[in-house]
A protein has these predicted regions:
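Catalytic cores and adjacent flexible loops of soluble metabolic enzymes
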Residues: 1-223
Length: 223
């Protein structure tokens, strides 16, 4: 994650401690996708410079829009493993698509295995059939979209479905209360922005916990 606490120095020191304890692989889990690309590159460069034998993996979600640039910075700094996705589940609040990342790495001169497009399309077809059959009922359609609003609040895209469902549940009650006070009612977008602002405000007051389960739900619920 990214905050006044979670700096490059903080993560570099943490990695050094883990390696000293015997870790052979370090995974940078950028669960909300708000890690700044240049900072991620600095972290990986430090690890690979001091410990070239350590395998470095990057896992970052696409919600706020940093992930493609982050993957490029991590790769250029010596990253080894990158978590990607494929259609129809790539992008949105998930991961960049393997095709895009593969072509980007090739353009930078990295050796990347060729994608079996026949297998890709078959897996794509099967996944879409599951979504059309039953899986789609459990996926909020707005999770298909990226949102720069997530940059400030730092919430992971994976919890957006439950967050939006929760807002729907309280929306009418909030507007009823506002109306009783003679105040203007809020539409869903206005309510969402206010919640994001409140998360951004309350997060440091709760100690800047990494916004991943269960802390992301806790911070969101307090907000």
């Amino acid at each position: 994650t990214h905050s006044q606490v979670h700096t490059a120095e903080y993560y570099i020191n943490m990695a050094e401690k883990l390696i000293a304890e015997g870790a052979q692989e370090i995974c940078l889990k950028d669960m909300a996708g708000i890690g700044r690309p240049t900072v991620l590159g600095q972290i990986v460069k430090s690890i690979k410079t001091n410990h070239p034998e350590i395998v470095v993996q990057y896992h970052g979600h696409t919600g706020p829009g940093f992930s493609v640039a982050s993957m490029l910075e991590v790769a250029k700094a010596g990253g080894d493993v990158f978590d990607v996705a494929m259609e129809p589940l790539s992008w949105g609040m998930v991961h960049p698509d393997v095709i895009t990342i593969s072509e980007m790495f090739k353009a930078e001169g990295f050796k990347v295995p060729e994608i079996n497009m026949k297998a890709y399309m078959e897996a794509r077809r099967l996944t879409q059939s599951f979504m059309d059959d039953f899986l789609g009922y459990f996926i909020d359609p707005r999770n298909r979209f990226m949102s720069s609003l997530l940059v400030g609040c730092g919430l992971p895209g994976g919890m957006m479905g439950s967050l939006l469902a929760g807002l729907k549940g309280v929306h009418a009650g909030i507007n009823s209360n506002l109306k009783a006070q003679g105040k203007a009612e809020l539409n869903e977008d206005e309510l969402l922005v206010q919640l994001f602002d409140e998360v951004k405000y309350i997060w440091p007051k709760l100690g800047n916990p990494p916004l991943v389960t269960p802390f992301s739900q806790y911070v969101k619920n307090v907000a």
